[in-house]
Structures are given as structure tokens and as C-alpha cells.
Amino acid sequence: MAQKLYAGAKLRELRVKLGLTQKVFAERLGASLPYLNQMENNHRPVSATVVLALAQEFGVDVTKLTTSEAERIVTDMREALADPVFTDSPPLADLRLVASNAPAFARAFLDLHRAYRQTHERLASLDEALGRDEADLRPSPWEEVRDFFHYCDNYLDAVDRAAEHYAAPGGVRRDVFSAAMETLTRAGLDLQISDMPAIRSREGNALRLSARAAAPTQRFQLLHQVALLTQNDLLEATLDLARFQTAEAREIAKIGLANYFAGAALLPYRPFLQAAAETRHDLERLADLFGASIEQVAHRLSTLQRPGAKGVPFFFVRVDQAGTITKRHSATRFQFARFGGACPLWNVHRAFETPGRFLRQLAQTPDGVRYLLLARDVSKPGGSFTAPVRRYAIGLGCEVQHADALVYADGLDLKGSFEPIGISCRICDRQECHQRSVPPLEKRLRVDPDRRGLLPYEIVD
């Protein structure tokens, strides 16, 4: 049965933006006034007739009415409310109600909790902020940019289509390296491959790329420069819509947008989507076909969410050797902890032990959703004996209902047992987890001095 669509907040926001009364809005939607009122308050789902009217009458992208954003807000609120500062956590139904009916309030709450957490961390570490007259309680520029990409599903339609038009006009791929060289020539820039530690450097009329960087990295950096040269107006317009609070966040986001363009040009949407389906998402074959790295391919797969031409919904993550998440994107219901690392039961942590191999895992999260997870180590050599080697592990996953579209599902028992994993120990209520680091803050604990199990306490429902 199709899931009912509740989008009251978005209906109300659209009506207010258009300056229409409920009566006029209802008439243009072909709905009665009481029914519109019920839909705006999420007492009734949005009917198919209303969805069609929104598209035809107001040009609304109906894919924006889905609840994926609300689900991410609920996940973030659950994690925030697991903080010890809160005695009790509201029921999940209440959180879903807030996320659906008052998303702006929910985001304000998350901003407030983030400000509190930053203040608490400053006090705990006695850092330099204690000496300031005013502590900056706003999110850090990096966090602000991270949340921007997080809440747009890591898919930016205008930038993605511009990159596809550049790399595959008319849907036919062209040699992006040659195209990029033509762009540089028209801009009066000369490309130089130099032996230098910096990956990319522009000095005057010379664009220098490091000879120590791998070929996919060089191509990516070249296309990054193309984005800055040819898409500046588009990037600036996108930044204007984002309304970042600081100049630093805007500058970081512009780099992120140029990187997005580079990845989308290296792996243009329609040709890459078709190749992914034909190869059954074989990352190594896709990397060879497009001259990209495995990490670039995995990252791109997580962005294939164009309305009307969506790919398999993946999540993508990259962790360092300490387990810290350094990249995270999700087009699935799977969400990552905003603070700390990933669940230690996840196979991404074991990828460092098996270099050069893909690890497969069938896993189930506490909400009952089952996933096929892939993990592999990736190394980024420094290009010389004395240069440090950066080592990471990447994880890619999709819900098991899409597993047949992946070559990595072959030979796995998709109806068999699934390993339990979570998001963060603080919001995971699994009782028999041998890797738990802290107790779940939404549960009561029982401590028996005469008995010791896996944990020094018992989790009580």
C-alpha cells in the first residue's frame, strides 16, 4: 500500500508565500475549505487530486512534498534529545508531529542544542573562548555547510544539470579533459603539471596541478577550476538562496559547490546512471569506464536523486582510522550521528584490516530497516617517500529491497539473518550489544552488584 502523504507545513508555507487566503487557495486546488484546513494541520493526507493541482496550477515540484526531510529532522532531534541535559525524551510520534507541522521550530531547536553543546565543550576544555567577551554560539561554518548539503539530499539540480550539459551535451559524453583544456585556453590560462605538494594552485595565468596526484584527482581538480570559470553566476545564486550566516561558511560552500560540479561533470548524470544500471553498480567497472576513483564513484552514486530519473537510493560515508566520519551523505532512511563516529558494529571499521577488498554486510538498524552495506579502504599517497599517506575507509549502502540491482548481492542470503547495527550508542536501545560505549539515554538502567553480564548495567524497557 502506498504511504499516505502528509505535507501540511509545506502547503501552508506555499499559501502564505503566494499571499492567498485559505478560501482562494482551496478553490484553485479544487478542494473544499474544511479539507484544506485539515490537510494544512496534517489531520488528513494530501490527496492525489491536490498533488496534481499543485503541479499544474502552481508548478510545484511534487517530489519536494515527500517526508524525507522530516525523517532526517526526527533523527537529528532524537539524537539531540538523548543529551543528558534532557531528563526525558518525547515519544517518537510527538517528534514526527513537530517535524511535519513545525519544521522551522524543529530546526531552531537543533540550532539551540548545537549552540549549547558548543558552549559546553568550550567550558569543558577551558579553551580560548572563555577569555572572550562574547562566545560565538552560532554553528561553525563547517557545520553550517555540512547541514546545507545534508538537508538538500546532497542533490543540487541546477548545478548537476549544468555539469551534465558541460560533460555530455545532448546526453552524449565527450572527453571532459579536452573540453576543460579548451575552457582554460579561452580563459587565457595555461595548464602546468608540476612536482609540488599542493594538489592545485592558480598563480596568474598558470593553473598548476600536482604531478604527485592520481589521474582521477587531477581531472577532478581541473573540472573544479572549470566550475569557477564558467559557472560562477550559478554558484553565487545558489549561495544566495542558502543564506549562510558567515562569510566563511559561504566560502566553504562555494568550494563544495565547485566540487559538486566537478564530480557531476566527471560522472555526468544520465550516462553514469545508465552505466550504473548496466554494470549492476560495480564500482570498479564504473571507475574504469569514467576514469574516476572508487571513492568518486561511490560518492556520485549517493547523489543520483534527480526527480523523474532517480537511481538506487544509497548512503555514502568516509571514516578515518580513528573512526571519525569525514564525509557523509544519505539518500536513504539511514542517518548518521551528528556527533562522534559510526556504529562500531558496521563493517566500514573492518575495511582497514583487508586492504584492496570489498567487504559485504547484511545489517538491520533498530527501526527494523535492512541494508546491504559495502566497505573498502582507500589510500591517498603523498607522492614521495617522505610524504604522509592518508588512509580512509568508505562505506556505501542501500536498503535490501534494492539489493538485486547490485552485483555485490550475488551469493548472499537476503532472507537470512542480518547483523544488528545502530547510529549512535546514545540513541540505540539494543540491550545485548557487546560494543556499547555508553548507555542509551532514553532507557532506564538497573544495576545489580551481584551480577555482571556484557555490560555493568541492565537496560530496562
From Swiss-Prot:
Signal peptide: none
DNA-binding among keywords: yes
One cellular-component annotation, GO: cytosol
SMART domains per the UniProt record, alphabetical: HTH_XRE
Gene3D superfamilies named among the record's database cross-references: lambda repressor-like DNA-binding domains (1.10.260.40)
Record-linked InterPro entries: Bact_TransReg_Diox (IPR050807), Cro/C1-type_HTH (IPR001387), HTH_RamB (IPR026281), IrrE_HExxH (IPR010359), Lambda_DNA-bd_dom_sf (IPR010982), ScfR_C (IPR018653)
Domain of life where this protein originates: Bacteria
Domain called HTH cro/C1-type: residue spans: 11-65
DNA-binding region: 22-41
Keywords from the UniProt entry: DNA-binding, Transcription, Transcription regulation
Gene Ontology molecular function terms on file: DNA binding; DNA-binding transcription factor activity
Disruption of the gene: reported phenotype: Mutant is unable to grow with propionate-HCO(3)(-) as the carbon source. However, the mutant can grow normally with succinate or acetate as the carbon source.
Task performed by this protein: Transcriptional regulator that controls propionyl-CoA assimilation through the methylmalonyl-CoA pathway via regulation of pccB expression.
Family: Belongs to the short-chain fatty acyl-CoA assimilation regulator (ScfR) family.
Protein name: Propionyl-CoA carboxylase regulator
Species name: Cereibacter sphaeroides (strain ATCC 17023 / DSM 158 / JCM 6121 / CCUG 31486 / LMG 2827 / NBRC 12203 / NCIMB 8253 / ATH 2.4.1.) (Rhodobacter sphaeroides)
Native organism taxonomy: Bacteria, Pseudomonadati, Pseudomonadota, Alphaproteobacteria, Rhodobacterales
